[in-house]
């Protein structure tokens, strides 16, 4: 079987971290004997420069036909038109592909716990995933308005929107340590009451998964004081936005964190959570690990290459433990040097 992969290098450091990652993918495919077809398209700010839009119809159609999308990074101060920003392309892409679930792993190995801003004995052994609902909730609720003396936002969820994200989280927990924490604000919000009810209903289909309901304020505290207690966390859009950013600092650098966006079926999108960092673009300083770990997610979730994903993650973590890192992690290696060392593992 041959997989179709679309590469979207994007802006800033995106092209340099993605190009090295694609070279790695080629070596990995040769070792693990799978085939893929690769297409690359301009996306984000660079697409605005070339075509006047962050997402062309050609790029969108290519993404719709793909098994997986690898995205570098988008955005930057160059593109200031509020009606035509690079980020609009990503929002349209997510909506067009119905990517309603955002998956963010947070992992801290023993040898990397010193990088965290938290105490080593607190973070060592952290291995959690936050599953955030991405396309509903208060960010998309209607009515919504701002007037001179008042403003309104609407928080609405349907049972179908809740169930589909909850099932993704249950399936993920079932493959991991079988612990699911559902985060809500059930003591105040009506939508959270429905959320908790749906979680309890779906739980009947996953008898082996232990479910714990937690209020969002308590979860935000426990993420910092006892992150190792969590396996899979599932929550709605606003809460997930905040909690996933909170969790992303636990490993010690935004440059370490991968992410994936899932729909019910079809194309999935993989990208590091960091921005385009235009201040260091083309300076060979960017931390590539978030992008490389996003490739590992892609190998596991879209290309059915679990062994390859495990090996790639192990190599990255061994580099971090031995201080083969870029400057943001206290190392002295340049981006190109990290990729050279990574590729040597497959030669």
Curated annotation (Swiss-Prot):
Superkingdom field: Bacteria
Binding-site list for substrate: 94, 104, 132, 217
Catalytic activity as recorded in UniProt: (2R,3S)-3-isopropylmalate + NAD(+) = 4-methyl-2-oxopentanoate + CO2 + NADH
CC annotations in GO: cytosol
Keyword line: Amino-acid biosynthesis, Branched-chain amino acid biosynthesis, Cytoplasm, Leucine biosynthesis, Magnesium, Manganese, Metal-binding, NAD, Oxidoreductase
Location in or out of the cell: Cytoplasm
Enzyme Commission numbers on file: 1.1.1.85
Known pathway: Amino-acid biosynthesis; L-leucine biosynthesis; L-leucine from 3-methyl-2-oxobutanoate: step 3/4
Subunit structure: Homodimer.
The protein's name: 3-isopropylmalate dehydrogenase
Source organism (scientific name): Staphylococcus epidermidis (strain ATCC 35984 / DSM 28319 / BCRC 17069 / CCUG 31568 / BM 3577 / RP62A)
């Amino acid at each position: 079987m041959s997989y179709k992969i679309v590469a979207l290098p994007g802006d800033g450091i995106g092209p340099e971290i993605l190009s090295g990652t694609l070279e790695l993918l080629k070596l990995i495919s040769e070792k693990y004997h799978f085939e893929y077809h690769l297409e690359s398209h301009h996306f984000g700010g660079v697409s605005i420069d070339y075509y006047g839009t962050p997402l062309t119809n050609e790029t969108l159609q290519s993404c719709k036909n793909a098994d997986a999308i690898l995205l570098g990074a988008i955005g930057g101060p160059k593109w200031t038109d509020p009606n035509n920003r690079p980020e609009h392309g990503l929002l349209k892409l997510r909506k067009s592909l119905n990517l309603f679930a955002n998956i963010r792993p947070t992992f801290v190995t023993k040898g990397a716990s010193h990088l965290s801003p938290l105490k080593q004995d607190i973070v060592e052994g952290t291995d959690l995933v936050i599953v955030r609902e991405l396309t509903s909730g208060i960010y998309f609720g209607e009515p919504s308005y701002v007037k001179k003396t008042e403003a309104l936002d609407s928080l609405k969820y349907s049972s179908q929107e809740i169930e589909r994200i909850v099932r993704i989280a249950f399936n993920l927990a079932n493959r991991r340590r079988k612990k699911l924490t559902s985060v809500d604000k059930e003591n105040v919000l009506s939508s959270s009451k429905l959320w908790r009810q749906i979680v309890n209903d779906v739980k009947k289909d996953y008898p082996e998964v232990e479910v714990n309901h937690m209020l969002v304020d308590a979860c935000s505290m426990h993420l910092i004081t006892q992150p190792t207690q969590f396996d899979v966390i599932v929550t709605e859009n606003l809460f997930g936005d905040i909690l996933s950013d909170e969790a992303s600092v636990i490993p010690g650098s935004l440059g370490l964190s991968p992410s994936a966006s899932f729909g019910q079926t079809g194309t999935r999108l993989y990208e590091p959570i960091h921005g385009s960092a235009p201040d260091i673009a083309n300076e060979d300083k960017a931390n590539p690990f978030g992008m490389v770990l996003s490739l590992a997610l892609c190998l596991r979730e879209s290309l059915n290459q679990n062994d390859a994903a495990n090996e790639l993650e192990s190599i990255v973590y061994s580099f971090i433990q031995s201080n083969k890192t870029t400057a943001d992690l206290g190392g002295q290696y340049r981006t190109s040097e990290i990729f050279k060392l990574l590729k040597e593992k497959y030669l």
